[in-house]
Amino acid sequence: MVLVSETPSSAHLRWAYMDHWRVETPQGPVSQYTSVAHFDRFLKQIAAVGFEAIETFDFHLGVLRELFGSLEKCRDFMQERGVERVLSLFHAVMYDERQSMPHVPATHDRMFNYARYIMESSRGLGVENFIVMPAGLYYDVEPVTDEKIRACADLWNRIGQMTQDYGIRTCCHHEFFCGIRSAAEIEKFYEWTDPRYVFFYCDTAQHVIAGVDPVELYRKLHARCGGFHFKDTQNVDRTEDYRRRPDAEIMAPTTPRWFWEMGAPQGLVDFPALARAMKQCGYRGWVSVEHDKADVGAGNYPESTALAAWYRKHVFERIYA
């Protein structure tokens, strides 16, 4: 992201795809990481609708190395199909106060060392962002206190400084069930983190579900915005589903499907307002499209991806241009 004085145009945005992809087969849902052939078809489909990079979880690093022999060869394979890089790795650490919990300082050394291991393990893919949930699950953190938020800030300042040595930004992504979820908690967290080392990753649907306006939040934090996850939702959590164990996204009895592709009917994210805000604030760079659990209720990932790409091209980019 670069702040500039001249007016941006849609040519200043590049589009990435945050990977939750699965396809239905007679054997059930199949991931693209099961074979080179599946990965090939996945890359060609997303490239065909205008995505130039992917984001994925860091636990896929070993699989990609096994499929292609090295991450450099994997990136060559991707580029031959029109996908430039793995833009971001989402850190899939299992938060546990015994060994990895951001608000527990005794676990910080282990978390730091694991993050450094991911940095070393990801060389060759062109990664630019290390995306993290900055606190544990809400029910593991509550009551959320200033002391706990400061402890989280201390950890990510330390890790963020280290990832800069690898040319990678540490970006914080606030799920609606995260221990740092409200506007007040988020404001404190970014006040107590170093803007040189810790960046904000704006997930539009997650903030809406948590009762936070992502457009207003982006305007406040635009100078620290490392990127976006564009997805929509039709629901705000009004019954404290964020406290559901073990996974609020799948255990909430009120909401069978939290996430939808941008432009979906009854969507609550104001993407036109966000496009105007990004234009006014001079945002340039990568934007990621995501549709987590798109296959709930007989949906599918290829369809959601194509619908989001249509909205991106025919609605969002025309406003931003």
What are these regions (language model features)?
Residues 265-280:
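A short, acidic, amphipathic alpha-helical segment used as a generic capping/interface helix at domain edges
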